[in-house]
Amino acid sequence: LTGKKVICLNMPIRQIKNEYDRGNEHIEWLKKNYPNVTSAEVNLTSIFEEMEHTYDNDIQDFLTMANTRARLRMTTLYAYAGHHKLLVAGTGNKVEDFGIGFYTKYGDGGVDVSPIADLMKSQVYALAASVGVTSSILNARPTDGLFADGRTDEDQIGATYDELEWAMLYIENKENYELNKNQKVAMQIYQSLNRA
């Protein structure tokens, strides 16, 4: 939308096929609709596997290795950004970044600019729909793509973004109405992550 040079990187690490295909579809849509957008693919699988062979087995739990993937991608983003004299743009929104801290420190949280950080998740969807982002992106269950088992953000967090956004706004707006059972669960999840 700005007309500035943009390079989209697809950085698969043993990526699940539908995640990989959806990412490529979105990159192709961006290139078709915005002449300032180019792309590159950097398959990081072999580098990640070398790290797995190097690390002691006892530290290779799901979360450690998921965060390792995010940090490997961040390093790659900065290699491209540095070479092309560009900035790394983040994709975190207000709910993820400031509401529950759902990002990897020095991974997807390691960015130069955060253009959608002040938008609630629902606003991100509205913005995406208004510029014509494809339905496969808009309708996909949000995932960070960092786990080999394909878990979604909701699987990891225990609540949907709609529920988390509701809880965040309930607190911000100093609401004071009686909560139903589902709202209480969502509020508990939100508050536990927000205070962490």
Q: Predicted segments — roles?
A:
Residues 19, 73:
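Conserved donor sugar-nucleotide recognition element shared by glycan-biosynthetic enzymes
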Residues 23:
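Conserved SAM-binding loop
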Residues 4-7, 14-15, 26-30, 34-46, ...:
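ATP/NTP-dependent adenylation/nucleotidyl-transfer catalytic domains that generate, transfer
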Residues 1:
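Walker A/P-loop NTP-binding motif
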